[in-house]
């Protein structure tokens, strides 16, 4: 990330801090902001609505694109909430246990409607009822994005609907300890519902840490994640049992990561904003990652996973995956290995169409790298 990119990213972060803490920024600082560059970075981090509200809070009238982004965020959240109510009503009717996840719950902790933008809604449900849920979603006008996933099915419908229906919280490859395989045992039923469940606050936070860790160690995770940590801890920290949380995160090897995220969030969103060098580096890393991570970071992770020692080795292993990879992403190949052949051509087709730009970008980054970067992984 360039120095200019870091500066604009920090401008975005300071505006988020301003509106969340209700602490106005100095006029001379506000005068030097570049609204166009700021808007681009905010879109990258899915923070245009929050920063629009921050600009207004600081008595700056944003132009039309900012106001439109805020209005879209509010509208989309309302549409997703209404649609989620219909989906969960069906799950109740069919006696299927379920649990809304992540952002659909976290957004309620933010001080203003639409402040936390939503790209999708995630719902964990009884995996044995996958066919029933699939039939319902298709009848409701949804189509699958790609093939059925190993741990979730992503359903899309115009104009803005995106629901990830989770069979598990993580794939087996991501949950190497098997900790989240017994998630249902940790859930508590919501009083006014028969089949809706929730985590305790402690287990919600543990999942929040694990989800952030997955992205942070992969392609990266954006600044919105830090805002989520601050918002959750601001509401819940005093009542949380951190002895239990730390003990559980030790099992996952994530206790140090949780401490870093908690300290960074609390120090960044404090009155004096004093961060250690490690915390400053974490903020810069998140500012460079965007909402869903950064492709260069993801390539580094993939290179390690593939144990590729050269550009050629990386590309060959990406183009011709192992059988373990096929079993992981296309579960039907476990019992029917011959399906690798049609799935291979299906994957090539997607690489050339749906994922064309992403794959071209990946190839460009690979070709720019020198061989030493792969050997130094």
Per-region residue spans from a language model:
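Conserved NTP-donor binding/palm subdomain of two-metal-ion nucleotidyltransferases/polymerases, i.e.
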Residues: 1-119, 125-377
């Amino acid at each position: 990330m360039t120095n200019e990119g870091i500066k604009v990213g920090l401008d975005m972060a300071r505006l988020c801090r301003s509106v969340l803490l209700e602490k106005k920024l100095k006029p001379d600082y506000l005068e030097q902001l570049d609204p166009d560059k700021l808007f681009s970075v905010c879109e990258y981090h899915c923070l245009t609505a929050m920063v629009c509200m921050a600009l207004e809070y600081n008595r700056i009238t944003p132009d039309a694109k900012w106001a439109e982004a805020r209005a879209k965020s509010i509208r989309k959240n309302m549409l997703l909430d209404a649609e989620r109510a219909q989906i969960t009503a069906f799950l109740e009717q069919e006696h299927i246990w379920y649990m809304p996840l992540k952002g659909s719950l976290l957004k309620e902790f933010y001080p203003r409607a639409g402040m936390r933008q939503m790209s999708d809604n995630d719902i964990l449900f009884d995996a044995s009822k996958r066919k029933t849920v699939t039939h319902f979603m298709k009848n409701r006008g949804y189509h699958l994005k790609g093939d059925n996933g190993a741990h979730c099915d992503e359903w899309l419908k115009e104009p803005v609907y995106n629901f990830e229906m989770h069979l598990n919280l993580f794939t087996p490859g991501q949950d190497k300890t098997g900790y989240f395989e017994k998630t249902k045992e940790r859930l508590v039923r919501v009083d006014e519902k028969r089949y809706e469940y929730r985590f305790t606050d402690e287990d919600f936070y543990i999942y929040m840490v694990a989800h952030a860790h997955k992205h942070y160690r992969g392609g990266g995770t954006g600044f919105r994640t830090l805002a989520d940590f601050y918002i959750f801890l601001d509401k819940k920290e005093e009542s949380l049992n951190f002895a239990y949380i730390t003990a559980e995160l030790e099992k996952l090897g994530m206790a140090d990561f949780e401490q870093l995220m908690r300290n960074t969030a609390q120090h960044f969103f404090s009155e004096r904003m004093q961060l250690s060098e490690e915390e400053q580096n974490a903020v810069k890393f998140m500012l460079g990652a965007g909402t869903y991570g950064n492709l260069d970071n993801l390539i580094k992770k993939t290179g390690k996973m593939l144990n590729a020692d050269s550009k050629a080795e990386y590309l060959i292993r990406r183009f011709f995956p192992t059988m373990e990879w096929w079993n992981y992403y296309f579960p039907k190949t476990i019992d029917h290995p011959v399906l690798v052949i049609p799935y291979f051509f299906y994957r090539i087709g997607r690489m050339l169409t749906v994922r064309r730009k992403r794959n071209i970008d990946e190839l460009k980054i690979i070709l720019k790298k020198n061989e030493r970067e792969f050997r130094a992984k």
